[in-house]
Amino acid sequence: MMSKIKIIQADSPAFIDQVFAIRTEVFVHEQKCLPSEEFDELDAVAQHYLLFENELAVATGRFRKTDKGIKIERIATLSQYRGKGYATELLHHLMEVAQTTYKEANCFYLHAQVSVKPLYEKLGFISYGNTFMEADIVHQAMEKSINA
């Protein structure tokens, strides 16, 4: 049976609970990040999205406007749903919505875990600067011009 995929903005408390549940599973339990590092004051200002397979929320991500451009953050897919292209689909959606919402922005940027850098490279993101530690995980700063 084909999986039915849908992406929605997590704009209700119930949806935000699902966002936080996915992030808790992936970042806190699986990757051992501290909850105090994973959940921050930016959750209140970012736009959050959920990707559903059939009726189950399996991936999430957020973006927000900054002085530099549009920062994409907290991309997470539940482990048993990885490898299906869901993060790619979610990222395409986030970039499309963000670009429409913030027409004046000229770049997307993010801090990629080095292990998933190829995902972002496939989407046209380019590394810059040295790798660095964030929540005890090696990260690489990456950006993509919106007009490229």
What spans do the regions from the language model cover?
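Short amphipathic alpha-helix that is part of the acyltransferase structural core
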Residues: 2-38, 43, 48
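N-terminal, polar/charged subdomain of small-to-medium soluble alpha/beta proteins
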Residues: 46, 77-78
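Conserved beta-strand in the GNAT
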Residues: 50, 56-64, 69-76
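A conserved beta-turn-beta hairpin within the catalytic core of GNAT-like acetyltransferases
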Residues: 65-73, 82, 104-106, 133-139
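Conserved acetyl-CoA pyrophosphate-binding loop and the N-cap/start of the following alpha-helix
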Residues: 81, 85-93
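Conserved GNAT acetyl-CoA-binding A-motif
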Residues: 98-112
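Conserved catalytic-core motifs of GNAT/GCN5-like acyltransferases
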Residues: 109, 121, 126-141
